[in-house]
Amino acid sequence: MADGIDRRTDDRLEFSTSKEVTVAPTFEDMHLKESLLRGIYAYGYESPSAVQSRAIVQICKGRDTIAQAQSGTGKTATFSISILQVIDTVVRETQALVLSPTRELATQIQSVIMALGDYMNVQCHACIGGTNIGEDIRKLDYGQHVVSGTPGRVADMIRRRHLRTRHIKMLVLDEADELLNRGFREQIYDVYRYLPPATQVVVVSATLPYDVLDMTTKFMTDPVRVLVKRDELTLEGIKQYFIAVEKEEWKFDTLCDLYDTLTITQAVIFCNTRRKVDWLTDKMREANFTVSSMHGEMPQKERDSIMQDFRQGNSRVLISTDVWARGIDVQQVSLVINYDLPTNRENYIHRIGRSGRFGRKGVAINFVTSDDVRILRDIELYYSTQIDEMPMNVADLLS
């Protein structure tokens, strides 16, 4: 498991996939550039995961592709490797564009592309809101092979003619369910309008609700599908529990009782609003507990430094909104607490997928008031999973 993907669970993933998709058992079988293969092995991959072995070849052939697989199965590397295979680094123009719902995810994708493309001399820029616009303009004018960004800033840079689109041959929508949800739909259309008509579209996500699949028909041509059946999306390897807290006010004491357990590893605590994140952070600190916190309203610099501290293990407990739930990979997180149950069931899998990345064991604990029982049952039904009452020895499951 040197590459961080657990082959035992990975081999059991069942794909509901287009007939023409074949499996490439090794990276060599994909006929990738020599310099790219070097980057892949240097990054720590030994052999492709289930989604990689099916999707990379199809994307490299130029096919529009919909790839769905669980959190932590190597989806980011799937499109990153494909992009690096198809771009021509001699041409200093943007040839691939990746759109993500959060700034942190866009930045993480940039670092994956840079690492995998380490021997290729690739230029990749993170084009995200909340950062200096002058720096964006300077980088884009210099010429970037790949741009990884958030829809608002990318659309702005295209309109200002700093992000030139005429050489773009691939558009990737990462965490497409969130991107295509209400907020970003218009901005994506905005970006898409400026792209050359022959642009290949790749859609990647852990969940693909029907309305998203329906929307992809508008800008994808005969897409090849690499899909995991929904019943398979139970996030094997992650133990899910609930704690019954009769009233909202009792959640805080319950969390304090759990604090010693949290710090055995690293934990993320999810709240539904930024006000709740701020309130809970203040209350925990007043009670002399060490926590850090993050939400979408914080300045980008502050968010970056909190993320860095957490990644390096300097902070062990992070309180956050759903801005953190999508695709952020911190290897040491093995406990997620839903202080508030997510308001939509798709976000549940994104949140608890933060623990147990790449097939490692993880634990998810849901605080459930009497008002929440219905939501919990709905989540169980949707993912065909069972969420049991938390046992007393939860600490043993983490150590």
UniProtKB/Swiss-Prot annotation:
Q: Which Pfam families match?
A: DEAD, Helicase_C
Give the Helicase C-terminal domain ranges: 237-398
Spell out the subcellular localization from the entry: Nucleus, Nucleolus
Q: Name one GO biological process term.
A: rRNA processing
> Per the record, GO CC terms?
nucleolar chromatin
According to the UniProt entry, where does the motif DEAD box sit in this chain?
174-177
InterPro entries reported in the protein's UniProt record: DEAD/DEAH_box_helicase_dom, Helicase_ATP-bd, Helicase_C-like, P-loop_NTPase, RNA-helicase_DEAD-box_CS, RNA_helicase_DEAD_Q_motif
Query: Can you give the residue ranges of the Helicase ATP-binding domain?
Result: 56-226
Q: What is its EC number?
A: 3.6.4.13
Under the heading CDD domains, the entry gives: DEADc_EIF4AIII_DDX48, SF2_C_DEAD
Please list the residues that bind ATP: 69-76
Q: Which reaction does it catalyse?
A: ATP + H2O = ADP + phosphate + H(+)
Q: Motif Q motif residues?
A: 25-53
GO terms of molecular function: ATP binding; ATP hydrolysis activity; RNA binding; RNA helicase activity
Q: What is known of its domains?
A: The Q motif is unique to and characteristic of the DEAD box family of RNA helicases and controls ATP binding and hydrolysis.
Q: What is this protein called?
A: ATP-dependent RNA helicase fal1
